[in-house]
Swiss-Prot record:
GO cellular component, one term: extracellular region
Primary location: secreted
Pyrrolidone carboxylic acid modification, residue list: Q23
UniProt-recorded name of the protein: Potassium channel toxin alpha-KTx 15.8
Site location (Aromatic residue of the functional dyad): Y58
Origin organism lineage: Eukaryota, Metazoa, Ecdysozoa, Arthropoda, Chelicerata
Organism of provenance: Olivierus martensii (Manchurian scorpion)
């Protein structure tokens, strides 16, 4: 599975964080609604939504 460097860096920061949820903004464009399939493919979680035209995934 290919990860862009920004997503990989964000995942590293999220995994080291002691705080709750972490947001990962992808480069995938969207037009409202859920980004579950994108988030599942990009970071392995199904939690995500479209914010400002980009899919944002949430990792606990």
């Amino acid at each position: 599975m290919k990860f862009s460097s920004i997503i990989l860096l964000t995942l590293l920061i999220c995994s080291m964080s002691i705080f709750g949820n972490c947001q990962v903004q992808t480069n995938v464009k969207c037009q409202g609604g859920s980004c579950a399939s994108v988030c599942r493919r990009e970071i392995g979680v199904a939690a995500g939504k479209c914010i400002n035209g980009k899919c944002v995934c949430y990792r606990n």
